[in-house]
Amino acid sequence: SDGVTQSGSVYTITKAGEYTVAGLLSEGQLIVDAGDEDEITIVLNGTSITCSSGSPIYVKNASEVKIKSEENTFNEVIDKRAEATDDSSDDAGNAAIYATCDLKLVGKGALVVTGNYNNGIQSKDDLSIKNVIVKVTAVNNAIKGNDAVDIESGNIIAISAKGDGIKTSNSSISNKDNQKGIVTITGGNIDVYAACDGIDAAYGVDISGDGNLNIYTDTY
């Protein structure tokens, strides 16, 4: 479709809009490389994306990306690269779903993410979750927003074999005078199984509302 280029099994979204992904993409990638002001919605409508050479979903450039799991659909994203859990966990492409911009997970369907390489889902900026059923299993951090993680609602399972369940890493003040590094939970049912910390916030954790949060730390 317009706004998408294809090279083999690599599909690149190049401009703002809504794009629907369905079916099997084996050893392929979905890349977003759009303009700085472009907002993009990726609708997952029953899809399986696996890759052993890079992040299966890699947002290289955009203003904001929403990944919407369509209601009554099951979607999976599997990073099959060999494990690399060194200190470079902030590097580009270091997660099964990796975004250099704000990333929002929405929808009423199910999203299962496996990060065999390093992190599960990571945004270099803010990561937010609303409504969606999401299960993330990763060797390092399951859910990471460098600047912020905001969970409003949904059913979330985060499993980390060697790292943290939910993590922020940047505690600086933004140019709009906002404090970075906060994990905010205002709702949802959240189960975290982590080798290190259930929640590791660079600045602080803010929990309010009527969510359910269970944290188990052990070896998984």
Please annotate each region the language model reported:
Residues 1-220:
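A composition-driven surface/loop motif
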